[in-house]
Amino acid sequence: MENCVSSAALDAARTRLDAAEAARETILLQHIANGVIIDSRTVQIAPDVQIAPGAVILAGTILRGHTIIGAGCIIGPNTLIEDSIVDEGTTVNASQVYGSHLGPHNNIGPFTHVRVNTVTDYGVHLGAYVETKNSNFARGNTVSHLTYIGDSD
């Protein structure tokens, strides 16, 4: 069986991968210089993401879109946050958050799926295997585990 990928194509692909990795490292180094603690080379942060000093970003975390992470947050490991605001002191552990606003000092996860238009107030806990969509959670609300809450206030 012949190799159907030319040497020139492989060289071009390697060049693109090297450029992408250099851009990723530049973004990580900018955040580290601003006081963000980044725990791993497996972290991916999009250019438009804002992270306050003192936040901790753990291994396997992906931050995309217009995401804002507050001071003192712990994000990860293995967390995806896209187009969302995470206020100060919030922990998001091994979860996914899309188009939502997590208030201060929340505890999210593990394995929680926060879908669009979820808004949490101070001190909310969304436990293991919780899924939310288009819902508001008042100060101190707790959802322990294995729960779906959607289209509610």
Where are the regions a protein language model picked out?
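Terminal amphipathic alpha-helical/low-complexity segments used for targeting or macromolecular assembly
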Residues: 1-54, 60, 105
